[in-house]
Amino acid sequence: MRHACALLAALLLCPMSAMADEEPDIKFFYPVVTRRPVIERELETSFQHSKSREGRASQFSGALEWPITPWWQVEVEMPFAYRNPNDAASTAGPGNLELQNKFLLWKSVQHLVLVSGGFELRLPSGSERRGLGGEIAVEPFVTGGIGLGPFDVIAAIAYEWNLNNVRGPREQELTADLAVGWPLSRWFTPFLELNTVSKIQGQEGEDAVKLRGRTQLYLTPGFNVRPLPGATFRMGVELPVSGRREFDYRIHAGLVWEF
């Protein structure tokens, strides 16, 4: 019975893989906040820096994205964080390890449409005591992209749950993002993102901005530059447009190598 099940799975998966290999790839630009629906094999380094009323924070990350099959991708990301609060000593060290599984749900080459879904798991490799992490969280998501005339449109929605007893500011959080890019040439694409964050549950200090039950709204203008074939540099600045905000600004930058 075991061998029969394995044979049946192979017969089902092989045609799917062959069809996916025969179809041309659908490429989209690289936002800095919104998740992409593309199944890809890449190395990426990224940097974030934000300023808020509590202080400043920076993060440098390295990530590997690897397709197990043409419709299943695994990503591993390891961040290194630096925190500089206004009322405490600065701290630095590794943050929470992030593991992501992404599955291609629908692909239409004719209509230039991709839809993917999956989940991200955050593991407590960061220090809770030093404010660098410590939470275990899971975040299911759905993301899709479509080519509309000269524009690429990408949308994503995700919900994060905290799974352990380390209570942080993001115990439950809903995010929804929309990104529009305009490829002006093969090497340059400007884009604009609309990013929303709704904190459903989470700790809030007495002097902190009250964000629970509120929807934060951010606009993120940015651009992609392809300095070399297979390499893309992306950069954007996330700016709040709502009264309730987690930060005053956040700078995103990253370099992606396709291989």
PLM regions with names:
Residues 20-259:
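Transmembrane beta-barrel domains of Gram-negative outer membranes and organellar outer membranes
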Residues 1-25:
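Cleavable N-terminal export/targeting peptides
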